[in-house]
Amino acid sequence: MRGPSIDWGIILLKPGETMADVDHGHHEVDETFYFVEGSGVMIVNEKLHNAPQGSVFLIEPNEIHNIKNNSEDQLKVIFIKGEYKPEDKYEC
């Protein structure tokens, strides 16, 4: 669901996949990730954080991030941004 006051959705990653080809950040918007099914790695400012099922991460503005499925099972993650600002995203 995108806009106007919230942006959220479900990310499905196959084994070995990443959320994006390159890490990215947001100038103004916080983003929350909830690892619903499977396990993976949350990458924040080039640091790797294990993310087993049930993990929650709050990514603040200007924190560079990505997600990788390093398991052998599908990874399902919910993302939530409090405001829909597609122009706020930048790649690194």
Briefly describe each language-model feature range.
Residues 1-23, 29-30, 80:
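A short glycine-rich, His/Asp/Glu-containing loop-to-beta-strand
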Residues 28-40:
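Glycine- and acidic-residue-biased ligand/ion/polar-headgroup-sensing regions
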Residues 28, 47, 63-64, 73:
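A generic "binding-loop/recognition-motif" signal
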Residues 21, 42-43, 59, 65-71:
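Short beta-strand His + acidic residue motifs that chelate non-heme Fe in jelly-roll/DSBH
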Residues 7, 66-92:
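Double-stranded beta-helix
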